[in-house]
Amino acid sequence: MAKIKARDLRGKKKEELLKQLDDLKVELSQLRVAKVTGGAASKLSKIRVVRKSIARVLTVINQTQKENLRKFYKGKKYKPLDLRPKKTRAIRRQLTKHEENLMTKKMQRKSRLYSIRKFAVKA
């Protein structure tokens, strides 16, 4: 089997990708048997290509799966941890803008009654 390109895999359905993955795994096992029994050098060099192809197929499967999950959870209140934006621990624990601006009743009354003083600087 020739080297597989990821862009060709992206157009395929999941069933086709899984079938191709099985075919590649069978081919890899045959190549490994050939390696043990002393196969040709061309077969030995093909092991690497097949391994990389398996990795490509798995990568495309996982990426499409994650993309579908992102679409499903778009606009929902709660998302799985791996779909949330990756930030530092400190940033995740920071107060939101709304939480920062919240005031107690006493503070609201005080700010309403005593507004901020404005001073004019004489030049």
UniProtKB/Swiss-Prot annotation:
Its main location: cytoplasm. The keyword Cytoplasm applies. Belongs to the universal ribosomal protein uL29 family. Signal peptide: none annotated. The gene is rpl35. One of its GO terms (molecular function) is structural constituent of ribosome. This is Large ribosomal subunit protein uL29. Component of the large ribosomal subunit. The ribosome is a large ribonucleoprotein complex responsible for the synthesis of proteins in the cell. Plays an essential role in early embryonic development. May act as a haploinsufficient tumor suppressor. It comes from the Eukaryota. Disulfide bonds: none annotated. GO terms for biological process: chordate embryonic development; erythrocyte differentiation; maturation of LSU-rRNA from tricistronic rRNA transcript (SSU-rRNA, 5.8S rRNA, LSU-rRNA); regulation of cell cycle; translation. Disruption phenotype: Embryos show various defects including an inflated hindbrain ventricle and smaller head and eyes. Mutant adults show an increased incidence of cancer, notably malignant peripheral nerve sheath tumors. Component of the large ribosomal subunit. The keyword Cell inner membrane does not apply. PROSITE patterns: RIBOSOMAL_L29. Keywords: Cytoplasm, Developmental protein, Ribonucleoprotein, Ribosomal protein, Tumor suppressor. GO terms for cellular component: cytosolic large ribosomal subunit. It is found in: Cytoplasm.
